């Protein structure tokens, strides 16, 4: 066995794992009808003129199953947080109570659930494409090593096995998220 080729295989697996984790984080940000602070991950607040992630300027809690409460560390940015939420794609009206902001998540309609499932499927396809790109790059690196034909074939089969395994994990994650979205 070739030490360089083994290192390339490890690197490929690490990159595929990171792609899967990134997809998991994207899925966590998809609203399911239950309050989840991760849906606010993409919200950026103008804090002293700098766009800052909401999580860095406020604590986010889940007081009820359908509600999020955002309490800023600095009350002077309550209006900025409210503006950031209003301009986001969340379509959730913020309620400012003077010390924090409440977001009540309405129940998802059947049509909205199906639309979210389609979005999840698009994310899954992008995740699979990323994994296939990792496979392609890994195969190119392996071919440049000048291995014997048999060794090269064995390593390329290993890379394909990793690719198949991670694509299957993406499918499982997608099925799980889709079922969660369609569960009324």
UniProtKB/Swiss-Prot annotation:
Does the keyword Cytoplasm belong to this entry?
yes
Tell me the PANTHER family matching this sequence: MITOCHONDRIAL RIBOSOME RECYCLING FACTOR PSEUDO 1 (PTHR20982:SF3), RIBOSOME RECYCLING FACTOR (PTHR20982)
| Matching NCBIfam families | frr
Alphabetical keyword list:
Cytoplasm, Protein biosynthesis
Family as reported in the entry's similarity comment? Belongs to the RRF family.
Q: Name the Gene Ontology molecular function terms of this record.
A: ribosomal large subunit binding
Q: What does this protein do?
A: Responsible for the release of ribosomes from messenger RNA at the termination of protein biosynthesis. May increase the efficiency of translation by recycling ribosomes from one round of translation to another.
* UniProt subcellular location: Cytoplasm
- GO biological-process terms attached to the record: translational termination
InterPro entries documented for this protein: Ribosome_recyc_fac, Ribosome_recyc_fac_dom, RRF_sf
**N-terminal signal peptide:** none
Q: What Pfam family is a match, any one?
A: RRF
Where does it sit, as one GO cellular component term? cytoplasm
What is the name attached to this protein's record?
Ribosome-recycling factor
* Principal cellular location given in the protein's record: cytoplasm
Tell whether Glycoprotein is among the UniProt keywords. no
């Amino acid at each position: 066995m070739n030490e360089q080729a083994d290192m390339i295989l490890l690197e490929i697996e690490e990159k595929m794992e990171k792609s899967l984790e990134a997809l998991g984080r994207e899925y966590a940000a998809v609203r399911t009808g239950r309050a989840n602070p991760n849906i606010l991950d993409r919200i950026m607040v103008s804090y002293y003129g700098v766009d800052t992630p909401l999580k860095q300027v406020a604590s986010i809690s889940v007081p009820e199953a359908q509600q999020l409460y955002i309490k800023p560390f600095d009350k002077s940015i309550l209006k900025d947080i409210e503006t950031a939420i209003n301009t986001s794609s969340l379509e959730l009206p913020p309620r400012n109570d003077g010390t924090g902001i409440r977001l009540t998540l309405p129940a998802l309609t059947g049509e909205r659930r199906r639309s979210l499932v389609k979005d999840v499927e698009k994310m899954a396809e992008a995740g699979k494409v990323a994994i296939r790109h990792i496979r392609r790059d890994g195969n190119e690196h392996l071919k440049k090593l000048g291995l014997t034909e048999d060794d090269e074939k064995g390593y390329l089969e290993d890379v394909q096995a990793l690719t198949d395994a991670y694509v299957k994990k993406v499918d499982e994650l997608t099925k799980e998220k889709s079922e969660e979205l369609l569960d009324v």
